[in-house]
Amino acid sequence: MYDIKKWRHIFKLDPAKHISDDDLDAICMSQTDAIMIGGTDDVTEDNVIHLMSKIRRYPLPLVLEISNIESVMPGFDFYFVPTVLNSTDVAFHNGTLLEALKTYGHSIDFEEVIFEGYVVCNADSKVAKHTKANTDLTTEDLEAYAQMVNHMYRLPVMYIEYSGIYGDVSKVQAVSEHLTETQLFYGGGISSEQQATEMAAIADTIIVGDIIYKDIKKALKTVKIKESSK
């Protein structure tokens, strides 16, 4: 079993987006700590299987971040289950999870399931609209969410998601200071080695996604943060 606490860098691939075989090979051979498959819309069983089958040729951890029950399947090392803490719709807190457990609970290996306390921060993102997230958050709001995740829910991961834009470093720093046990994931807008370095100095793990489809060379440079220590 892999130890996710040692992961500093994850590449996140959207099964609904095209990636060439050469670019996928470069991503999987880049020394990233893991590959995560996940997206907001058009995530289907077919496109998840298609992408998973290509990545499985490489010897690195593979994660499915669950966005709908229909695309859940065996064959992944971990299943990351988001609970969107700032969603106004209970379905994105635990409603989808409830349905999944009713259907698959008898066959789940819970050692492979990681519960993520998600906070969505970009109002213009697809994920914010889809999850009906309240993104009008102060630093104090985020600190309270961090305390909730770390001390009360005791979740293994808190994921600060800016999805498409580079986040407010001071707010991410404030969250980090309140997490003593929970691992901090940051994702959103990382498009350069400099941004990756800046966020990796605060978060335990950075998630790099969109830039893969815009500039593969810049995406690959973000892996260099593994050479530094947090």
Curated annotation (Swiss-Prot):
Q: Name the source's superkingdom.
A: Bacteria
Which amino acid positions bind Mg(2+), per UniProt? Answer: 14, 40
Q: Which InterPro entries match?
A: GGGP/HepGP_synthase_I (IPR039074), GGGP/HepGP_synthase_sf (IPR038597), GGGP_HepGP_synthase (IPR008205)
Q: What cofactor does this one take?
A: Mg(2+)
An example Gene Ontology molecular-function term? heptaprenylglyceryl phosphate synthase activity
Q: In which pathway does it act?
A: Membrane lipid metabolism; glycerophospholipid metabolism
Which positions are annotated as binding sn-glycerol 1-phosphate?
12, 159-164, 189, 209-210
Q: So what EC number does this one have?
A: 2.5.1.n9
NCBIfam families with a match to the protein in the record: GGGP-family, PRK04169.1-1, PRK04169.1-3, PRK04169.1-4
Family, as annotated: Belongs to the GGGP/HepGP synthase family. Group I subfamily.
Q: What does this protein do?
A: Prenyltransferase that catalyzes in vivo the transfer of the heptaprenyl moiety of heptaprenyl pyrophosphate (HepPP; 35 carbon atoms) to the C3 hydroxyl of sn-glycerol-1-phosphate (G1P), producing heptaprenylglyceryl phosphate (HepGP). This reaction is an ether-bond-formation step in the biosynthesis of archaea-type G1P-based membrane lipids found in Bacillales.
User: What is the recorded name of this protein?
Assistant: Heptaprenylglyceryl phosphate synthase
Organism of this sequence = Staphylococcus aureus (strain Mu3 / ATCC 700698)
